[in-house]
Amino acid sequence: SEMCIRDRYRFAKWGKIKIGQALQLKKIPQRVFSPYLNEIDEDEYLTILNNLLMTKRKSVHAENEFELTNKLVRFALSRGFEMKDIRHCITLSDENDNLE
């Protein structure tokens, strides 16, 4: 299950929540895969999420910043990322936009 977790977040770009749900569907007990989810490198995980959000931001059409943020949050949640990580990446992205 460790390799499955790595593949899902590196290649399929899934978040921890969606990976956990997929493993539970395969009847793998949470006590087996939970330690591996906790071992995911936080920096790499946030980089993947940030890249996903930047790519999605380019393709999303929104009338204002509020609508854009909502669409990005819904997209990231559907990929299984946690709200705290999504908010962190969106805040960083907004700060970078303001610097330019």
Label each region the model flagged.
Residues 1-100:
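An alpha-helical, amphipathic repeat domain used for nucleic-acid recognition
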